[in-house]
Amino acid sequence: MEKPKLGALKDPEDKRDYPIKAFLKAKVTVLPTTVDRSAGLPPVRDQGGEGSCVSFATAAAKEYDEKLFSSYFSPRFIADRIQLDADSGAYPRDAMDVLLREGVCPEECQPYVARIHTDSCLK
């Protein structure tokens, strides 16, 4: 497996964001030292050399939400809507906006193929 590029960008501040403290009513004094929820998650997939981790994470979150483990949603569908190019990175908020406004198609409708930027494209 090729070493994946990390393309997640920190979302810009948005006045609609709420600090977590706003939702915590009771004080939690004891937390477990570890939590492993991996048994309920889709398997890790290979994004190749493209910085498309946000697209893969978003597709996997939707698969988890719908308990869809026998097939995949298309990270390519999401990446094509939120990335300028293979190396531009992406904001998680933009990926969530794609799910909200457009949904996401199954992998078989738009298969993922990594798009790798090379300097030869700039010449």
Language model features by range: what are they?
Residues M1-D36:
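N-terminal zymogen propeptides
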Residues M1-L6, L31, A59-E63, I82-K123:
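Predominantly the structural core of cysteine protease catalytic domains
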Residues P32-T34, S38-P42, P75, R101:
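Generic secondary-structure boundary/loop-capping signal
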Residues T34, S71, P75, P92-M96:
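Alpha-helix initiation and N-capping motif
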Residues A39-E50, I82-A86:
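A short glycine/serine-rich beta->alpha loop
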Residues Q47-S70:
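Alpha-helical support elements that line or immediately flank enzyme active sites
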Residues Y72-D85:
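Acidic helix-start/capping segments at beta-turn-to-alpha-helix junctions
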